[in-house]
Amino acid sequence: MRIYNVVGYALLILHAVVSALLAPPPLGPVGGLVVGMLYLMFIWLVAGLYLPEILNMGIAHRALEFKSWFVKSTTLLCNTLAIYVNPQSWVNRHRHHHAFSDRDGDPNKLGADGFWKTLYLCLFPYKCQFDLARDPIFATWPMRLASSSAFAVASQFTSYAFVWAIVSDWVYALGLWFSVGSSACGRTWCRTTGPTIGGSAPGAITTATTP
């Protein structure tokens, strides 16, 4: 078993423990665990559709086609209530990663980067050299909004407020919100350190969405 598998399973166990221990008395440990797992499944469903399917396969690689309204609405939903991922920056970094995998120009990691450096790069990646995300869909207002710095900050409050509105306990909500965010970071690191798939991506790729 590789270390990123260990990290992933450890984060899932941590989320389960947090869900049970921080649950308010009306829920109890069992109820808290159930709510925590349901919240994790919601994040997994929405973010799993948004990041690997829409951003990765749909826009970055043009391997899947989606209606543009579906892309934009899912982008706003995920970034507002679930996990924030800047769509334009992510596509740009991902195309750099495939064009310069594990060498100079790859914003995710270099061949010599170890465990801790790669983990650090999940939050603070190397600077991209080019603008490889010039797709027309990024000029639409929902994608411009989701790619803005102000929205990135506001989304941290809206995603927490969403959890608090469900459980009505700020400590429990904060525990769920933080543990799921940690799991998402761990999953991003696993994707970054895993084997590279696919080929290089040219700069002027158009999105595979349809009107």
Task: Specify the residue positions occupied by each region the protein language model found.
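Low-complexity basic/metal-binding stretches
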Residues: 179-191, 195, 200-202, 211
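Short low-polarity hydrophobic stretches
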Residues: 174-175, 192, 206
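Active-site-proximal inter-transmembrane loops
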Residues: 82, 138-142, 200-211
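Non-catalytic, topology-defining segments of multipass membrane proteins
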Residues: 1-186
